[in-house]
């Protein structure tokens, strides 16, 4: 598999993370250092999941394909509901000011957006590809896309305040629902 094919795969795998980062950036003000750290967490998780899928290879494929869509739906849906609830709360403070999110929650969110990359890793196990290089490309693309999403979302969040947090929750739920419905064959 060539570099450009891997790059297209990497960009495709980073789109869910980009959408989540856009929503997260709109809801929570982040300084540049926090943006970089969050982007690195997402990129690292996104790079590790295709490696895990590749290692699992053929034997794990039936098991993974049975639950990946449910895991994404539950993780992203739960996080989305939490964001929507916080977006609807009557508190007057600026939700973007100092909201802190634990490393664990960031990793959990990153994992929720990277489950499809694990399946890609399984597929790459059956192709002529350097999996370490492929994982590095996927991780770097995701790191860049998440940083861009957080920064762009931050610019939008100042305009929309709590509505941005509610909308971000809707985005997470939509991504989780789309993942579930597409894996169940109900949408294309």
UniProtKB/Swiss-Prot annotation:
GO-annotated cellular components: plasma membrane
Primary localisation category: membrane
InterPro entries in UniProt: Mntp/YtaF, Put_MntP
Molecular function in Gene Ontology: manganese ion transmembrane transporter activity
Bilayer topology annotation: Multi-pass membrane protein
Transmembrane annotation, as ranges: 3-23, 35-55, 63-83, 107-127, 131-151, 167-187
Places the protein is found: Cell inner membrane
Keywords: Cell inner membrane, Cell membrane, Ion transport, Manganese, Membrane, Transmembrane, Transmembrane helix, Transport
PANTHER family named among the record's database cross-references: MANGANESE EFFLUX PUMP MNTP-RELATED
Function: Probably functions as a manganese efflux pump.
Entry similarity comment: Belongs to the MntP (TC 9.B.29) family.
UniProt name for this protein: Putative manganese efflux pump MntP
Taxon lineage: Bacteria, Pseudomonadati, Pseudomonadota, Betaproteobacteria, Neisseriales
């Amino acid at each position: 598999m060539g570099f450009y094919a891997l790059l297209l795969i990497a960009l495709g795998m980073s789109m869910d993370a980009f959408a989540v980062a856009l929503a997260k950036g709109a809801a929570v003000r982040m300084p540049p250092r926090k943006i970089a750290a969050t982007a690195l967490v997402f990129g690292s998780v996104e790079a590790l999941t295709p490696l895990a899928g590749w290692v699992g290879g053929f034997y794990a494929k039936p098991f993974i394909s049975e639950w990946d869509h449910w895991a994404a739906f539950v993780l992203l849906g739960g996080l989305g509901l939490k964001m929507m609830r916080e977006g609807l709360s009557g508190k007057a403070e600026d939700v973007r000011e100092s909201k802190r999110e634990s490393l664990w929650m960031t990793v959990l969110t990153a994992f929720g957006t990277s489950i499809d990359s694990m399946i890609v890793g399984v597929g790459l196990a059956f192709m002529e590809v350097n999996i370490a290089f492929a994982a590095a490309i996927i991780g770097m693309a995701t790191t860049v896309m998440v940083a861009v999403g957080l920064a762009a979302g931050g610019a939008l969040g100042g305009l929309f305040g709590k509505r941005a947090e509610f909308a971000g929750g809707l985005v997470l739920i939509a991504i989780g629902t789309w993942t579930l419905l597409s894996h169940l064959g109900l949408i294309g």
